[in-house]
Curated annotation (Swiss-Prot):
GO terms for molecular function: argininosuccinate lyase activity. The gene is argH. PANTHER family: ARGININOSUCCINATE LYASE (PTHR43814:SF1). GO terms for cellular component: cytosol. HAMAP family: Arg_succ_lyase. It is found in: Cytoplasm. The keyword Secreted does not apply. It is an enzyme of class 4 (lyase). The keyword Acyltransferase does not apply. This is Argininosuccinate lyase. It comes from Lactococcus lactis subsp. cremoris (strain SK11).
Amino acid sequence: MVEKLWGGRFEASLDKQTEEFGASIKFEQRLAPFDLKGSLAHVKMLGETGIITAEEATTIANGLIKVEEKLMKGQIEFKIENEDIHMNMETYLHDEIGPLAGKLHTARSRNDQVATDMHLYLKSVLSDLLKALRTLRETIVNLSVNHVDTLMPGYTHLQHAQPISFAQHLMAYYQMFTRDFDRFEFNVKHTDMNPLGAAALAGTTFPIDRELTTNLLQFEKAYANSMDAVSDRDFILEFLSNSSLLMMHLSRLCEELLLWSSHEFNFVSLSDNYSTGSSIMPQKKNPDMAELIRGKSGRVYGNLMSLLTVMKGLPLTYNKDLQEDKEGMFDSADTILTSLSVMDGMLSTMTVNRVNMEKATEQDFSNATELADYLAAKGLPFREAHELVGQLVLTCIKKGIYLQEVSLKDYQALSQLIEEDVYEILQSRTAVSRRNSLGGTGFESIKKQIEQAKKELQK
């Protein structure tokens, strides 16, 4: 039987099922490099403050480096009987340097140790995530540059509303992902904090130097309150909340890619690299990757709700419930990083069917607003113009024609304000080009949006 580091107070050992139920090493293994990093900073501080001798600190540090080397070579076997990542690492350190390993835990608790590990882990994830989001935003901007003059229907209620530029549609997602970027960047602020030195909850009687470990671990600052340091999981909840918003945006884009790639729309074709086939229908090309991203949004939402539910009833400070804070964080990190990479690949390699997109703007009544605006610009109150055009649309539907096919004679019977220039106004390209209000779909407006985005991406 492996001796528990906390076993002195107990007369009996855990039974096997209970031991397995309470062990977290099955999912904590990815914290190993961060646990060792935290321990190296801690032992350096212990040595420099004289809490242990310089010789002891050097021996422990060298032992930790050897454990780190074994970890990198895949020579570490994680054992359930050692419970968690901390005790697994300390056991290997003990194998390297003997009983001196026990001095590493001076002025430290697993409570501040695990919090430190998670702050370090999430800082690393956020760094990778911000890079991935920047890459996706760049891809969207580059795609937009190529499609400023590509027309498509804009939708409300999934019905044709007004003609727009495809670039305008894409740049709407650029804005969403930029907000995601900003949220995760702010998330770094609350993650970049050092809990090490808070010990179990009340600090320590040893003359530790928390500023030193803060600098060694490259944290922005140390927690100001030891109880908050060991019980705070807001930084993870922020991450999960931000991840949920990101997955919602990715899911919305996936839904549109699924629609656009359907036979009925045929606006885009996704690359074979991001599609699969059917085991029974030879003709099928299924947009599975877009469907998977859409589906995986649910698990990220679930991870957020799971931790919120865990946290809502916890008194200060540490409770074993907090063991449930990791798997959802790990899963969400894996999910969003992979989803971002797959989305970037899908957008980079998809084929845009410009002809079908533009044709779709001509075989509808999405130019009805142009006619109403045309009449309003000539002095007719917009509400009256709206009523007249609505009646005309109904007449056209009954006749099986579109507004651009109505004769000038019939137009002038509707209103003497209408002249021959109305046919130019009714063209989709004209309709789009005229909408150059700030943020509008006009070609000049979109170019300004793209230029602004390029400046933002250079920061």
